[in-house]
Amino acid sequence: MNVHVSLSVDARHEKVLVTFLIENRGERRVGLSREIATDASLSRRLFDLRQHPGDVEVPYTGRMVKRESSSLNDYVELAPHSAHMHTIDITRAYDFWPGTHTYLICYEDAVLTDVRQLDSAAKISTEKVMFSYTQR
């Protein structure tokens, strides 16, 4: 599997917008979780968000949806030699501290290396991205 994932953050204009980019550089289709690929809002603590310095976890305060076991319908296929980008507004989903602070964010999950097999999951993770945000 030759998959590359990354995050970027735009914390201007009183919002924290996280853009997830996945590139399938391989020869086979991979399955990407719908919640990171297409969902408009979070339904669980999808990102690891921490204050910097100090490594204090920022509490997730967004909605929590109890889900059934995963099925193949929970994944979006990503063709070989293609990329997918999706942006999610996390401003109201995490309890950002008042004032201006610096944070580190990353994403860790799995992709399906065979889009027909749920048990073909392989771990993916992004590098930590540092950003500053002012909570008013």
Where does each model-flagged region fall?
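Structural beta-strand segments of beta-rich domains
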Residues: E14-V18
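Asparagine-centered strand-capping/turn motif at beta-strand->loop junctions
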Residues: F20-R29
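The feature marks short-to-medium sequence segments in extracytoplasmic or secretory-pathway proteins
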Residues: L32-E77
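Short Pro-Gly-centered flexible turn/kink motifs
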Residues: V76-D89
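Terminal connector regions
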Residues: R92-R136
